Amino acid sequence: TDENGDMQLAVSDMEIYSYLTPEYIASKLDVINNASLCVIDTNLPAETIQYLCENCTVPIFADPVSTAKAVKLLPVLGKIHTIKPNMLEAALLTGIPVTDERSARKAVDILLELGVRQVFLSMGAAGVLYGNARGKKRIPNYPAEIRNTTSAGDSFMAALVMAYLSEFSTEK
């Protein structure tokens, strides 16, 4: 990590994702569809994401992970219940530059028009822009001493899942 707590380099063996094929997921579909929701990220193969979005009957929460991998969500955005992009990923998914709150609001509108039910667009130090069919709201970050940002996005997704399962309102 650097002096700001941001990861500078990571080494990961991503081969395990290649085993999560549509065929394998099909063998587990009953389990998935009996869950309360399904969380995916774009480390999954594109064909597996497509299969899940076509066959999963529970809400799908998606983490775009990176701009390089977020493209896998383009064909299935209308099947995603909740998405958690950052500004770069939102720009890729919507086709517009996302550089400030105004453009972030437009990106949220586009994602909602494409069929996504809830958008939590991370704007770094500016907080998160939340949007759904009822409107949009910027949620500021709580002041905190940041020591390390590794897995911050994963923790945020876990909190979104917990809030959804607990039927918390966005304001809560």
Where are these regions (language model features)?
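Conserved beta-alpha-beta core of the PfkB/ribokinase-like small-molecule kinase fold
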Residues: 36-106, 126-128
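Short glycine-enriched, charge-decorated loop/helix-capping segments at active-site entrances
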Residues: 13-15, 95-99, 144
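Short, flexible helix/strand-to-coil boundary loops that buttress conserved ligand/catalytic motifs
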Residues: 11, 94-97, 132, 150
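Conserved N-terminal subdomain of the carbohydrate kinase-like
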Residues: 1-36
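Conserved phosphate-binding/catalytic region of the ribokinase-like
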Residues: 69-70, 74, 101-172
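Structured loop/turn residues at beta-strand edges in well-structured enzyme cores
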Residues: 33, 78, 114
